[in-house]
Amino acid sequence: MKKFLLKPKKSLGQNFILSSEITKRIVVLAGNLEDFNVIEIGPGYGALTKEILAHNPKSLLAIEKDSNLVKCHDQLLNEHQGKFRIVEADALYVVEEELIERPVKVIANLPYNISLALFLKWLNKIKLFTTFTLMFQKEVADRIIARPNSKDYGSLSVLSQLLCDIRREFDIEPKEFFPRPKVYSSVITVKPLPTQRFAVNLEALTKLTRAVFAQRRKMLRNSLQNVTNRTETALENAKLSGNERPKNLTVEQFCLLANNM
């Protein structure tokens, strides 16, 4: 890092991994890469990038918003011509399918400030991807994997678990990063399902879950008033009493409710 004399930018959510052991663990979790095109978001100084390339992917596309950091990768680009390329862009606005061919795996230490928005974007085009191996702030990972009746369970949990198998692999202490963040991080693996667990319109489900979890302490009968004019019919068809609170419903029950609104 000292070689480039670049200070990480808090505005871009930059926290770089110091430990090569951690980068190895992350890439090993992604499994075989030789037959896959890989996307990395925010390669930074290249610690994770080098480890990905060491596992011989079919190709690696790195997306980096910081123009100064893009310049740090000239040596890697020369060493891996035809296999590694870096695009200077905001990952939130990149159209991945225009830049890379399937099959695609994503391996990334996601910038804190865009991690949630980026994951939601990917969920909406989930069939493009084979697997994700991702590092989030622990609190975001907690929300993704949360189960019913837990404090972190919400709209993000429902949508993620409808579309994917998700597993928390390990947590990482702040001391393993530069600069040192104030929070722990978590690495999760995400495997998109061939089809949704339950048949449901995703737009209707998202509208429903966001509305009721915005009033998560209210009983469903009350929180649904702002979502549908068929509250009682929807509850009856979904076999719900209306006295439940949003956190009590399973993913399947949310899908039944959305289908009957």
UniProtKB/Swiss-Prot annotation:
**Mind telling me which PROSITE patterns this protein's record contains?**
RRNA_A_DIMETH (PS01131), SAM_RNA_A_N6_MT (PS51689)
Where does it sit, as one GO cellular component term?
Answer: cytoplasm
The organism's place on the tree of life at top rank: Bacteria
Q: What is its EC number?
A: 2.1.1.182
User: What EC class does the entry list?
Assistant: transferase
Query: Which GO terms fall under molecular function for this chain's record?
Result: 16S rRNA (adenine(1518)-N(6)/adenine(1519)-N(6))-dimethyltransferase activity; RNA binding
**Main localization of the protein described in the UniProt heading:** cytoplasm
Which Pfam families is this protein grouped with? RrnaAD
Annotated compartments = Cytoplasm
Reactions the enzyme catalyzes? adenosine(1518)/adenosine(1519) in 16S rRNA + 4 S-adenosyl-L-methionine = N(6)-dimethyladenosine(1518)/N(6)-dimethyladenosine(1519) in 16S rRNA + 4 S-adenosyl-L-homocysteine + 4 H(+)
Keyword list, A-Z: Cytoplasm, Methyltransferase, RNA-binding, rRNA processing, S-adenosyl-L-methionine, Transferase
Chain residues that bind S-adenosyl-L-methionine = 15, 17, 42, 64, 90, 109
InterPro entries named among the record's database cross-references:
KsgA/Erm, rRNA_Ade_diMease-like_C, rRNA_Ade_Mease_Trfase_CS, rRNA_Ade_methylase_Trfase_N, rRNA_adenine_dimethylase, SAM-dependent_MTases_sf
Per the entry, what this protein does is: Specifically dimethylates two adjacent adenosines (A1518 and A1519) in the loop of a conserved hairpin near the 3'-end of 16S rRNA in the 30S particle. May play a critical role in biogenesis of 30S subunits.
Which PANTHER family does the record match to this protein?
DIMETHYLADENOSINE TRANSFERASE (PTHR11727), DIMETHYLADENOSINE TRANSFERASE-RELATED (PTHR11727:SF7)
Name the family: Belongs to the class I-like SAM-binding methyltransferase superfamily. rRNA adenine N(6)-methyltransferase family. RsmA subfamily.
| The protein, known as | Ribosomal RNA small subunit methyltransferase A
Q: Which organism is it from?
A: Wolbachia sp. subsp. Brugia malayi (strain TRS)
- Upper lineage: Bacteria, Pseudomonadati, Pseudomonadota, Alphaproteobacteria, Rickettsiales
